Amino acid sequence: MFGFIHESIRQLVIRKYGEDVWLQVLERSGFENGKENIVNHYYSDTDTYVLVDSVSIVLKVTKDQIWEMYGGFLITYSMEIGWDELVRSMSPNLKGFLDNLDSLHYFIDHVVYKANLRGPSFRCEENPDGTLMLHYFTGRPGLYHIVKGVVKEVAKLVFNLDISLVVQGRTQRSVHMNNGERVEEHVIFLIKNVEEPRRDSDTSTTSALTSVEPDFGEIIDDNLKVSLQDFSRALPYHFVLDESCRLVQCGDELYNHIPNELLQPGTPILRIFEINRPQIPLDFENICNFINAVFVLQVKTSPLRKKHMNAMTKEEREQEVEAMEEEVESNELTQGCHLKLKGQMMMLSTKKHIIYLCSPYVTSINELMQFGMRLTAMPLHDATRDLILLNQQRLSDVEVNLQLEANNEQLETMTHELEVERQKTDSILKDMLPRKIAKQLLSGEHLEPCEYEATVMFCDLPAFQQIIPVCQPKNIVKLLNEVFFKLDRIVVLRGVYKVETVSDSYMTVSGIPDYTSEHAENMCHVALGMMWEARSVMDPVNKTPFLLRIGLHSGTIIAGVVGTKMPRYCLFGETVTLASQMESLGVAGKIQCSSWTYSKAMETGRFEFSPRGRINVKGRGDVETYFLMRSLKKSIWEITDHERDVNVNSIEGYEELEIFIENAQTVKHDGHPKANQNHSATCTIA
């Protein structure tokens, strides 16, 4: 069904029950929010039935009640969105409105939305007692409750009537059409006026329910002054049928689209046309039953075949006609290249003949050219000329709307993808900068450099220079990734900030951007954890576990964001320089701390330090230093978040760390190891 039906159902539920109820309906029916109500989209009947079933279940109302409620709301909603004037101007009474409902339905389907949908048909009869008998035909059984809601609401809003609709009969039959067999439901409604309508003084006295036949008075001269030739030229596409549905006469323009042999009087109309709408067998009785409907007939001959047949002999043309009829019987008729006629069937006064007053069903310039026609083929009085020009503009508007809907859908997809990419970018920025600083930067705040009391740590691999000459570059990168991955885990675990890595040098800081008085204690624990983690990575040259060289210093630093395109959080000050010297002047397998770090660490924590003595630091002279041995407050297992094997490991874990360092120092290294001259060594990465 057409998307407008879904949208009106959505409006009904939201207005009467709220947005939350509609979301429940969507969840139950399996529709994605925003994809269930695309107005110009065609949904399968199954989709619509699932949607209505979900509404019925969520609201705990029967489906018949939902359909009747929808029928009434459909009129209200349609009049709200711009169809008000058209609905009110259709007829002065309810019977006339119902008689013209087919044409309105056809106009909306085929002209406004260009949808070619399979709609219902209506026929209204007036009873002697003033009541109406409405015949409703549809190929979708079970939807007649919509008609009850529609007719009641139209009577109330347009004609100020309070009516009752009673189902008098409901039958189903199988109808054989050219395109196959289908089930058709026929429902008969009896319409009664419950209360006399309220009429203003300036309103016509004509009944609002039924029509009154006009009185033409005496006709002075009943002789027709128009000849058959003039009539055929004035109505160039008409034809007249008898009770046997055989051709009696036709308009001039039909000879340009249909072979002359088929337009001879007495030719069965089924040899010339097939019926598209209403979907009924093309015979005299059915035409009379649907006399108020819009009839669309399709010529069985294409324009190209007609031109080809004009050059044939009479016998060849007869053979071609027979071949054409065989194609129709085998459903090989191509819809796109056969002219359609749209118009009205009218019973003549003899009651034995029907005239079909019609025009080519052409709604655009492209279709006009397709049949080899020009605007001059339409009489000046024919509104089809104006319709073609107006609909050409309408098609452009519909195309623009479809493009806008496609663009909106694409924009939603791009917005979602952009949000995903933005989250990735934010995540990367938060990895590059402290989380607090990254949030301030993303919110557009101006960040001023700040002064902090913090502890800075540098560590490196003293044996790294021995590895470079004997390892492939990709193996070196793999080795550093393995080491730094383990160090990063300790940094995240202990809540300090990793500033940067340069070659094999690793720099971290504690106490910024969120100040803590335990910055020295935290960094000492990080150093012990890193020393433990490094023991699981093997030196590919010496075949021994790696030893880190670590240096710590505490003091005042300046920190701030440098750069805009690629912002970095940088540290400045003498504290950074001295921490770097603590590392470069340190010993492999040892954690060297300045006296400032020693003092700060002992204020908040409990550690075992071994005095190293005074060492000469460039620019500072002799500086008192200490080696950090162990923490008396936390075990290795608590620092590294590793589970202790009670059958193998000591309680604190520092004994294993000391033994590991002693074994790894069988080959003694000073602070500046010499490069290994044995270039024949092989490099293997564990």
Curated annotation (Swiss-Prot):
Keyword Metal-binding: yes
Pfam families, A to Z: Guanylate_cyc, HNOB, HNOBA
Gene3D superfamilies: 6.10.250.780, H-NOX domain, Haem NO binding associated domain, Nucleotide cyclase
Cofactor info, note text: Binds 1 or 2 heme groups per heterodimer.
Residue ranges constituting the Guanylate cyclase domain according to the UniProt record: 455-583
Organism of this sequence: Caenorhabditis elegans
Protein name: Soluble guanylate cyclase gcy-34
Coiled-coil boundaries: 306-335, 398-432
Note, other: There are two types of guanylate cyclases: soluble forms and membrane-associated receptor forms.
Compartments (UniProt record): Cytoplasm
Activity modulation comment: May be regulated by molecular oxygen. Probably not activated by nitric oxide (NO).
An MF annotation (GO) of this entry: metal ion binding
